[in-house]
Amino acid sequence: MPKIEVKNDDLELALKKFKRISLEVRRLAQRHEYHLRKGMRLREKQKIAQKKRRKFRSLASH
């Protein structure tokens, strides 16, 4: 479980940091959940990149 120190009673910043760290931990656990062949791993990586591009393109248009 990630630990975050709250400095200067700044709870909002501490929550942001905690969410970011816990998300990284979940992604790492999900990635190592089972073994993927090299080609499959590359396809998964490309899918994730494509989703990110779509997300940021839709945000840029607003």
Swiss-Prot record:
GO MF terms, alphabetically ordered: structural constituent of ribosome
Gene Ontology cellular-component annotations: ribonucleoprotein complex; ribosome
Any GO BP: translation
Assigned keywords, A-Z: Ribonucleoprotein, Ribosomal protein
Source taxon at top rank: Bacteria
The keyword Ribosomal protein is assigned to this record: yes
Family the UniProt entry places it in: Belongs to the bacterial ribosomal protein bS21 family.
UniProt protein name: Small ribosomal subunit protein bS21
Organism, as annotated: Mycoplasma genitalium (strain ATCC 33530 / DSM 19775 / NCTC 10195 / G37) (Mycoplasmoides genitalium)
Gene: rpsU
